[in-house]
Structure formats: C-alpha cells, structure tokens
Amino acid sequence: MTKDDESLDLVKQAIREAGLRATPARIATLQLLRESPSPLTHAAVAEHLSGLGVDKATAFRNLNDMTDAGLLRRTEVGDHVWRFET
C-alpha cells in the first residue's frame, strides 16, 4: 500500500467515523483542506473541485455537513467570508 493509498483510507475512515457517507466529493474536499497550508473559502474549495464535477451547492453543503460533524472548522475574520480548515 502506498502513502497516497493510506492517506485516502484515513480520509475515508475519518468521514465515516464522523457519521457521514464517504462520497467522492467529501473525500476530495477533506483531502484538499488537509493539504492546504491555510484556510480556504467556499469559493476556493468549489473552484478546486469543479474539475471533478462538484458544483458550488454540493461543495457548500459538504463544507457545512463536515463542519457540523466536527471534521472541519469554520472561521470568519470580519470580512463576512467563511473560511474552512481541518
């Protein structure tokens, strides 16, 4: 098993342990935010995932679901834009 396979398995496991289905969009979202050196906005996440066929509404819903499940943190620094991080 390669390091990438192990990382993917850990992401899937974390999503499932949080009580969510490990869909391709959620897996890609969590991987993106784990690899990001800084918090990302919904727009940035949606832009990164658009190449995978994930629309903005799905990206936003997944960010909220994963925040509610404790996988992500949501912050707002006074500019009325939420940023997400692991």
Where are these predicted regions, by residue range?
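Pre-recognition alpha-helix immediately N-terminal to the DNA-recognition helix
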Residues: 27-32
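Basic amphipathic alpha-helical segments that dock to polyanions
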Residues: 33, 59-69
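Short helix-capping/hinge SLiMs at alpha-helix to coil transitions
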Residues: 20, 34-37
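Non-DNA-binding regulatory cores of transcription-related proteins
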Residues: 68-86
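Short, Lys/Arg-enriched N-terminal segment that forms or immediately precedes the first helix
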Residues: 5-19
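Short, leucine-enriched amphipathic alpha-helices that occur as contiguous helical runs
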Residues: 8, 25-26
